[in-house]
A protein has these predicted regions:
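Rossmann-like NAD(P)(H) cofactor-binding subdomain of soluble oxidoreductases
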Residues: 36, 46, 55-132
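Internal alpha-helical scaffold of NAD(P)-dependent oxidoreductase catalytic cores
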Residues: 103-113, 129-166, 179-216
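Short pre-catalytic strand/loop immediately N-terminal to key active-site residues, enriched for Gly-Thr
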Residues: 163-169, 221-226
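Short acidic capping loops at alpha-helix termini that bridge into adjacent secondary structure
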Residues: 26-29, 88-90, 113, 197
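NAD(P)-dependent Rossmann-like dehydrogenase/reductase catalytic/cofactor-binding core
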Residues: 204-272
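Small-residue helix-packing motif on alpha-helices
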Residues: 29, 59, 195-202, 224
């Protein structure tokens, strides 16, 4: 399969890395990336990959799938640059947050075979999760897009495009929440007198081990939490402080704020 990426940043690089690791020929992958340094890094990392600085008819010729991997505010210009040449392409995939299929279709001159996805940064190590939505009638496009994102992690499909705003807030932004709590646990360990290297190792191992335990268990997270918590014990003392501070409610509010921002971003882009 011939794949052309519009944008060659971290997420595009992660997807290319996943494809190559699964046996894809780098020579079947093209990337349009205006930054000279990033183009050089991509070509050095994936020998045979074809990289160029501009969106021209040549980079879409023969492509089975075009992947838009640019920032949301760059999407309109990027789409309009390739619009005269996109009609023969079997499928388009966008991973730009907030950019709705209808708007991308409009910028592409009415192109109808679009799949929209929200990946996350653990894709950089092949451990991402992406949620995809396909425009009505884009079943064939969905079949082309799915394996591209499966190359760097799990995938799920949603039936309603508006659900991607919630997905953006949960899994798209989710790694930042995890890193926030990881950072706090590490800082607490240091403030309790542990050496910095040991604090980091303990925090990382605790998160990694807890997730392995959760994924391998049939128990709900609440039950797993209760299993660690003895009445009047050390864990209970910590959780009492979190409850008194309303941490759970505030955290839920934070995720909802991210979802609202995703919706607002989509609304703003729709006006272009």
């Amino acid at each position: 399969m011939e794949v052309t990426f519009i944008g060659g940043g971290n997420m595009a690089s992660a997807i290319v890395g996943g494809l190559v690791a699964r046996g894809a020929d780098p020579g079947a992958i093209r990337i349009v990336e205006p930054q000279d340094g990033q183009r050089t890094r991509l070509v050095e990392r994936f020998p045979g990959l074809r990289a160029s600085s501009g969106s021209t008819a040549g980079v879409l010729a023969g492509a089975d799938l075009v992947v838009f991997a640019v920032k949301p505010q760059q999407m309109r210009a990027a789409a309009q640059a390739v619009a005269p040449h996109v009609a023969p392409v079997p499928a388009v995939l966008t991973i730009a947050a907030g950019v709705r299929c209808a708007d991308l279709s409009r910028w592409l001159g009415g192109y109808p075979r679009i799949v929209r996805a929200m990946p996350n940064t653990p894709a950089l190590v092949g451990a991402g999760i992406s949620v995809l939505y396909a425009m009505p009638g884009a079943t064939a496009a969905a079949k082309l897009a799915a394996p591209v994102l499966e190359a760097c992690g799990e995938i799920l499909w949603c039936e309603r495009e508006q659900d991607l705003d919630a997905v953006t807030a949960v899994s798209g932004s989710g790694p930042a929440y995890v890193f926030f709590f990881l950072e706090a646990l590490e800082q607490a360990a240091i403030e309790l007198g542990l050496p910095a290297a040991e604090a980091r190792r303990l925090a990382y191992a605790t998160f990694e081990g807890s997730m392995r335990l959760a994924r391998g268990s049939s128990e709900a997270p609440a039950t797993l939490r209760a299993n660690v918590t003895s009445k009047g014990g050390t864990t209970a003392a910590a959780l009492d402080v979190l409850d008194a501070g309303g941490v759970r409610a505030r955290f839920i509010d934070a995720v909802k704020a991210a979802a609202a921002r995703a919706t607002a971003l989509g609304d703003a882009l729709a006006k272009d």
